[in-house]
């Protein structure tokens, strides 16, 4: 029985990394694979260390060598390994293997998951701090289709060891959140930083998909990233899918139009047309390599008081 003293205030208790890992390990129905490339096996290590992992972890693997990794997941057209496309291949390939090797007839109550990350930690010269993709493909009922959470992160720490440890903690937070906070995606996202210093990892892109997240608007998720200070800016496309800023803007001619756009008016449309016409007249600007970004700042959203999600 808990003791409550006069003057105690209600507060939200967040489990430690160890308790999160152990709770998952002790659930005899949660079963899956860990595949980690680029920063050790820090996420899986947390589950091994607390014990009772044999009924949870089907396999943990790190295909570090590029040739070996290519033989498993296939070559990337652009030759890059820390990409969302690589993450997608890892999640899909490992889930296919899990379903082929573990009989549903013998394990009717198991719900499967695959956790994957592909990262590059800080380089030897400490000029590039590193970044990565991590994600989880999972179900909370054996008969359900799989849901997914995928995110892009940037390391802010200056030591590879610290980056590895932070990645391990965030990975546990993601897996725990997927199983136990999927009904509250905004809280799930907030809890990704549990037990991490504010300056350790930046999340600049995250997307929720699948049956567990049917009602989730990923644009609002991206708004929350900025509102919580987890990143400075986010980009989403015309379909409402969050996209990686560096991937979309790299080597592009960028025309930015700032406004509140609530609603989009004739004036906005005319400004867009005239601005684009003028921009394309610049000598080094080619239309096929030009991208137009409509920018909305938090100041715009707060212009009439608190932020109204419906404006976004």
Located regions from the model:
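Nucleotidyltransferase catalytic core that binds NTPs
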Residues: 2-312
